[in-house]
């Protein structure tokens, strides 16, 4: 058991949100003093995660080529680099030409497509030199069909009624592991330990963290690995119980709720109801991962432009300001406008035709430097502001003298809003630099977003 008493209470006692005004004229933030003794999981409260798709990141698709982008990602402001799985991919029952990252045939080796173990070590070292953290995508649920365990330790695997090793859904390229067996769990944890000891990574993004994987696996994993160093654990699962052991969980429900609003299936008011429900289920302390895209959404559901249309910026502002820990997927910051092939080579075009880099840089910086927007109990609880329009979402967040006010038109039509005492005075819209007279604000353009720092 590790998370709340150690990570949350320590921060509260350390006074992480003892804030002082920032010196810059545009009031970007009131700087917060971070505790000297804070661990990485604690410090993640004001960080942004960046998902790295090595295969598609450069024409070469290697760690060495990716290293050239590290200074740019540092300038973007992202501080946690999540690498999709980097291990060798199975050949038996492989999907496509290159196969899925998530069909692993050796947990303790590097996919030669990406480079060598030494190459990855160098990437981690360079990231650390730039003050960034590295977490590795970990796939404990299944292996490739040509993983050595298939023949040497078939008892590690789940079997059907006929005694045959089984797979899940249409994932025909993977064999399902049985984590009710202590030997399976031990071998998996040993492999995770290898990457910490050999490459000095800072944590794990835990693929498919629930369902077939019992919570006691994560209890054993954190108990065995947390003493090695301060680790950050991100679960690809949307269930409160995961926070008994892990730091952050996917907020799939809010992601899909935003997509429903963009499609016109739900209103902004209904989106806020989803937020209230989420807070009721999880409380305010856990880190909830928010995003508008990731490798799954991009490959199978569509680009942000397909799913959000002209509203992609407004929904990005929402994910960075409502609560939780935000994430940017490879290429999102330059307007990636294609579904990246999942089993083939499909390089990202890094030409920022839509001019989005500065937009995302501003969002990352805003959240980094304003304690009101930090994750969990380190930031403020969102408070809805009534503007008498179901398509407009207005809210504020406050924390220790910091306050951010957000107004979002989440529709493709002009919207009228009612006056509210909380909307008063003339302020600068942080995102555009324009002055906004809140007292006289009556209409919002389609997908207009206003962010005020008070």
Each language-model region and where it sits:
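Bacterial N-terminal signal peptides that target proteins for export
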Residues: 1-8
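Carbohydrate-interacting/catalytic domains
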Residues: 19-82, 88, 126, 272, ...
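Hydrophobic faces of well-ordered beta-strands that scaffold small-molecule active sites
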Residues: 48-50, 81-83, 134-136, 204, ...
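Conserved short secondary-structure transition element at the edge of the structured enzyme core
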Residues: 316-334
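Active-site-proximal helices and loops of the catalytic beta/alpha 8
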Residues: 27-32, 197, 207-291, 307, ...
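Active-site beta-loop-alpha junctions enriched in small/polar residues
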Residues: 55-57, 86, 139-141, 209-211, ...
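Bacterial N-terminal signal peptides
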Residues: 9-16
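Substrate-binding/active-site clefts of carbohydrate-active enzymes
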Residues: 34-64, 68-79, 85-199, 217-227
């Amino acid at each position: 058991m590790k998370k709340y008493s150690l990570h949350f209470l320590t921060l509260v006692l350390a006074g992480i949100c003892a804030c002082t005004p920032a010196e810059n004229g545009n009031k970007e933030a009131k700087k917060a003093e971070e505790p000297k003794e804070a661990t990485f999981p604690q410090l993640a409260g004001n960080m942004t995660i960046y998902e790295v798709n090595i295969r598609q990141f450069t024409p070469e698709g290697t760690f060495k080529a990716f290293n050239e982008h590290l200074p740019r990602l540092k300038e973007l402001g992202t501080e946690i680099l999540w690498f999709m799985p980097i291990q060798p991919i199975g050949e038996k029952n492989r999907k496509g030409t290159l196969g899925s990252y998530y069909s692993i045939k050796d947990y303790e080796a590097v996919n030669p497509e990406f480079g060598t173990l030494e190459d990855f070590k160098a990437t981690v070292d360079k990231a650390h030199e730039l003050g960034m953290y590295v977490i590795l995508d970990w796939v404990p649920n299944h292996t490739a069909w040509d993983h050595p365990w298939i023949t040497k330790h078939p008892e590690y695997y789940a079997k059907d009624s006929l005694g045959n090793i089984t797979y899940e859904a249409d994932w025909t390229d993977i064999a399902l592991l049985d984590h009710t067996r202590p030997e399976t769990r031990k071998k998996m944890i040993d492999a995770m330990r290898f990457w910490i000891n050999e490459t000095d990574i800072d944590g794990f993004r835990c693929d498919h963290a629930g369902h077939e994987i019992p919570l006691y696996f994560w209890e054993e994993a954190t108990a065995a690995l947390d003493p090695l160093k301060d680790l950050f654990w991100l679960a690809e699962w949307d269930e409160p119980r995961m926070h008994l052991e892990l730091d952050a969980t996917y907020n799939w429900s809010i992601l899909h709720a935003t997509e429903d609003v963009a499609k016109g299936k739900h209103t902004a008011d209904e989106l806020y109801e989803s937020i209230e429900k989420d807070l009721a289920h999880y409380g305010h302390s856990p880190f909830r991962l928010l995003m508008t895209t990731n490798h799954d959404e991009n490959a199978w559901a569509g680009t942000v432009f397909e799913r959000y249309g002209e509203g992609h910026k407004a929904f990005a502002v929402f994910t960075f300001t409502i609560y939780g820990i935000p994430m940017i997927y490879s290429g999102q910051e330059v307007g990636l406008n294609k579904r990246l092939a999942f089993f083939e080579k499909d390089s990202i075009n890094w030409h920022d035709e839509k001019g989005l880099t500065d937009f995302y840089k501003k969002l990352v910086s805003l959240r980094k430097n304003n304690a009101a927007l930090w994750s969990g109990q380190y930031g403020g609880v969102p408070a809805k502001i009534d503007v008498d329009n179901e398509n407009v979402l207005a809210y504020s967040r406050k924390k220790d003298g910091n306050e951010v006010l957000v107004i979002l038109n989440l529709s493709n039509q002009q919207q009228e809003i009612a006056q509210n005492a909380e909307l008063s005075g003339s302020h600068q819209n942080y995102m555009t630099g324009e002055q906004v007279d809140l007292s006289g604000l009556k209409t919002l353009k389609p997908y207009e977003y206003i962010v005020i720092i008070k």
